Amino acid sequence: MVWLPGINDLNRDKNNTNNDKDPNNDLFQDLKTRLDSLPTSAIAIASFATGAVTAVFITTFHVRYGRRLKNGEWITPDFLGRNSWIKGVVTSVGDADNFRLYHTPALGGYTWPFKFRTIPSLSKDLKDQTLHIRLAGVDAPEAAHFGKPAQPYAAESLAWLRETLLGKKVYCQLIRRDQYSRIVAHVHLRPRILPSSLFRGRNVSLELLKAGWGTIYEQAGAEYAKGRKDEYIRIEAEAKFVTKIINSLLPIILNRAARRGIWKHGKSAETPAEYKRRYAG
């Protein structure tokens, strides 16, 4: 006689098959039961904590990558203490060792493919919208101001910095605030080939020394790129003496070679620091 399975046997086999297909079913049911057993107040607290953590994360992310620093008052001591990096476009160069920067945060709408904002070009639109940046570690010839005459080569030094920076994107590591409320910073140009998100371009302070349009700043509060003061000294020395060496070795180019920048008439040229001391009284 052939045995035929009953309905109960079929249901039992079906249940066994379902359990075989979902080995985590018991664990899921256990977790669901535990969650359902939690008091409403505990669930509310957990939801609030999750929301608070999310809000803090979003706010921190926005402050770091999306909020624009409109002027120096937006830069807090904590921000300077971290020696944070920012990027922006130079909108004006009024002196040979400082300039105005329009901050363009990474997620602020100033960079493709998310570009939907433009940088103002009119002076009235830039009022109170820029950071006053001072180049770290260097000093350039003083322009005429407060009744004092201009230092020799002040105009040439200013022209060099304008040619180097004006209208260009730069990266600034913010160091401190000086006595004139300017932000002292290590300033770098954009790299020519490599991605700017991973690499920095040329250090503008070192380029100023190399061109011969400034000296090392050695007064109180001097700041140099980490571990590179010797490089500042070396580059300044090269700017002073390189042409003298060339002229001594290659007289044929004597008429074309000239000392660099402020060292044109020799290393005895008055430095910006000496100029300031002379007019301090």
Swiss-Prot record:
Q: What broad class of enzyme is this?
A: hydrolase
Q: What residue stretch is flagged as signal peptide?
A: none
Q: Where is the active site?
A: 134, 142, 182
Tell me the ranges covered by the TNase-like domain, including all copies. 84-249
SUPFAM superfamilies, alphabetized = Staphylococcal nuclease
Q: Where is this region: Disordered?
A: 5-24
Which ranges does the record mark as transmembrane? 41-63
From the Swiss-Prot or TrEMBL record, what is one GO molecular function term? metal ion binding
Identify its protein family: Belongs to the LCL3 family.
**What is this protein's name?**
Probable endonuclease LCL3
